[in-house]
Design a protein with these regions (language model features):
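Short, low-complexity N-terminal leaders and the immediately following helix N-cap/first helix
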Residues: 3-27, 136-138
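Compact, glycine-rich, soluble single-domain proteins
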Residues: 11, 21-22, 26-105, 116-117
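Helix-rich terminal scaffold detector
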Residues: 2-4, 105-138
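Aromatic-enriched hydrophobic runs in primary sequence
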Residues: 9, 64, 82, 96, ...
């Protein structure tokens, strides 16, 4: 009898792209509060590990998601995470899932994009465009 081990890889599950931090709350036990409407749109569960990438200061950190009021647009960094960003910073919030490598082609992440200077959903896509050679570096 042979045991077959399927290789699993971590792959992007969901992304809130260029969301705006609406507040920070140092005296809270931790986490990132996210409008529950946005959590649902991105298929992010309450208490799920999230990775946050701050586009203003370059900070990259992990915490967990908690629900904020539905339709509020709230994205609040709580506890120690409050040191990683400021109100109005643009961030990317991602989750990852471990899937069998053979299932990669069937997977489509939930990608939520925001308009500039607001928390209104602009578009929902299922693939990230191929990066071209004409990208301007900073």
């Amino acid at each position: 009898m042979f045991l077959v081990t399927l290789m699993k890889i971590s792959i992007l599950k969901s992304k809130l792209h260029r969301a705006t931090i609406t507040n920070t709350h140092l005296d809270y036990e931790g986490s990132c509060a996210i409008d529950s409407e946005l959590l649902n749109a991105a298929d992010i569960s309450e208490y799920e590990m999230i990775h946050i990438y701050n586009l203003v200061n370059g900070e990259r950190f992990t915490t967990y998601a908690i629900k904020a009021e539905n339709g509020s647009g709230i994205i609040t960094l709580n506890g120690a995470a409050a040191f990683k960003g400021n109100k109005n910073d643009k961030v990317i919030i991602c989750t990852y899932a471990d899937i069998n490598k053979k299932d990669i082609k069937k997977h489509s992440p939930k990608l939520i994009y925001f308009k500039n200077d607001s928390n209104i959903i602009d578009t929902i896509k299922s693939s990230i465009p191929v990066q071209r050679n004409n990208v301007v570096s900073i």
